[in-house]
């Protein structure tokens, strides 16, 4: 399956005689496009206008597709081409709104001066009351320095804001959490850590997002050590949770015992190392890893994994292959062993296309579009915030992965990312794990 990242909507007019819409669809398919939604916007006396959403791999293929539609003739006309993705981002995707209407002086006195002074004094005397009288305990900072935005790299924090807004929107819709993007105009780990520590009183948790390797490790480790609220780097642990869930589902379908399988991780960056640690936390004994970086391989060794020198060796030794290198086509078909499970997770293009891996004998294969960390972070934070947990442990993350796998339908690797039940189950599993590991402040207080 080729990743098709360019989405456009075509306004196409066709004569009302049968077969003309089929001609348009055929032209789009032959030009390498996929058709999404088709919406009839106007029916004339002898013509019909439709919005047709198409997806293509790149700009060159888009131009070829448009030319193919324009050249159909016979009364078929391409009127406009619009970018609905850009349009959806106009004005941003999130907003901050008041929960209370302020329509009278009495309202004003209750929500602001003079009434608010008494609330401040209550919190001053009993700081724990901030959880009751403010939104702090339900608010998560989404922090980035813009150094590792999706598959785009170091494009800066402002260019990465659409990702942070998307994260905040998902927090709200899937977990009822207030996500606040925090853009940091620094790449210095000390400055990042100090800034987050200074603003942390206003948040119930910290989600680190798209912070590059290797300084992401130091930033997360220091913040987890110094703060008494949960901190998680989503590119590491969110990805690892959903990857473990996908592997659990695949192993269940194939009749494989994951704990006894050999797992090979290609790419030991932020996500790759976290995936290795997640599988080891689950109980997998043989976790192999390959990377060009000697430092990364030493990190893996320190975590208890087994570095290998070549991809061929890793492919030969492993039952389950996971790749997070960002290098398209890195895995050769001839390296694939019969019955392997292959998760090539790099976006926008995977290390091997799922179809190629399956043709070469893989039992299961998927790319990063189906294994999406949106299945993890909303429920994980909902669970830790509900529990009042001060940390996010591997036990909680494994519980989240098992919950996701438990909601996966037969034949799928992971459930639908927008299924509310999935996020509820993840939150419940994480909350239970938090209490079981005695990381919850509320449990310590006797809940």
Per-segment meaning from a language model:
Residues 77-261, 381-385, 437-439:
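Glycine/serine-rich phosphate-binding loop and adjoining beta1-alpha1 elements at the start
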Residues 78-80, 207-210, 231-234, 289-290, ...:
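General beta-strand structural signal in soluble alpha/beta enzymes
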Residues 150, 157-175, 233, 237-326:
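Glycine-rich phosphate/diphosphate-binding loop of Rossmann-like nucleotide-binding domains
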Residues 230, 234, 344-346, 351-445:
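Adenosine-phosphate binding glycine-rich loop
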Residues 303-365:
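Rossmann-like adenosine-cofactor binding region
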């Amino acid at each position: 399956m080729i990743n098709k990242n360019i989405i456009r909507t075509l306004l196409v007019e066709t004569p009302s005689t049968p077969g003309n819409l089929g001609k348009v669809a055929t032209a789009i398919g032959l030009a390498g496009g996929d058709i999404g939604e088709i919406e009839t916007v106007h029916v004339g006396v002898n013509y019909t206008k439709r919005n047709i959403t198409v997806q293509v791999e790149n700009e060159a293929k888009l131009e070829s597709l448009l030319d193919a539609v324009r050249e159909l003739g016979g009364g078929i006309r391409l009127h406009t081409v619009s970018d609905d993705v850009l349009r959806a981002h106009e004005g941003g995707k999130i907003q901050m709104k008041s929960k209370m209407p302020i329509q009278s002086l009495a309202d004003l006195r209750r929500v602001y001066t003079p009434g608010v002074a008494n609330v401040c004094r209550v919190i001053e005397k009993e700081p724990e009351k901030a959880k009751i009288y403010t939104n702090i305990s339900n608010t998560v900072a989404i922090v980035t320095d813009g150094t590792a935005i999706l598959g785009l790299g170091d494009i800066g924090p402002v260019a990465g804001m659409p990702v942070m807004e998307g994260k905040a929107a998902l927090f709200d819709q899937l977990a009822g959490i207030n996500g606040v993007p925090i853009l940091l105009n620094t790449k210095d780990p000390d400055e990042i850590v100090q800034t987050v520590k200074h603003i942390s009183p206003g948040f119930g948790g910290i989600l680190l997002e798209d912070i590059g390797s290797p300084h992401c490790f130091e930033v997360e480790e220091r913040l987890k050590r110094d703060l008494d609220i949960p901190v998680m780097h989503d590119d590491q642990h969110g990805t690892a949770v959903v990857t473990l869930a996908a592997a659990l589902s695949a192993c269940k379908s194939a009749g494989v015992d994951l704990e006894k399988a050999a797992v090979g991780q290609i790419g030991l960056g932020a996500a790759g190392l976290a995936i290795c640690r997640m599988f080891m936390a689950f109980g997998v004994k043989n976790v192999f890893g390959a990377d060009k970086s000697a430092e990364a391989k030493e990190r893996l060794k320190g975590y208890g994994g087994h570095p290998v020198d070549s991809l061929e060796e890793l492919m030969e030794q492993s039952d389950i292959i996971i790749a997070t290198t960002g290098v398209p086509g890195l895995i050769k078909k001839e390296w694939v062993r019969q019955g392997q499970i292959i998760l090539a997770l790099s976006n926008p293009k995977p290390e091997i296309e799922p179809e190629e891996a399956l043709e070469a004998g893989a039992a299961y294969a998927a790319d990063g579009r189906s294994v999406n960390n949106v299945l993890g972070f909303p429920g994980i934070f909902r669970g830790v915030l509900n529990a009042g947990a001060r940390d996010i442990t591997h036990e909680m993350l494994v519980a989240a992965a098992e919950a996701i796998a438990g909601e996966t339908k037969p034949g799928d690797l992971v459930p639908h990312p927008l299924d509310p039940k999935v996020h509820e189950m993840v939150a419940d599993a994480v909350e239970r794990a938090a209490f079981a590991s005695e990381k919850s402040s509320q449990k310590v207080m006797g809940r």
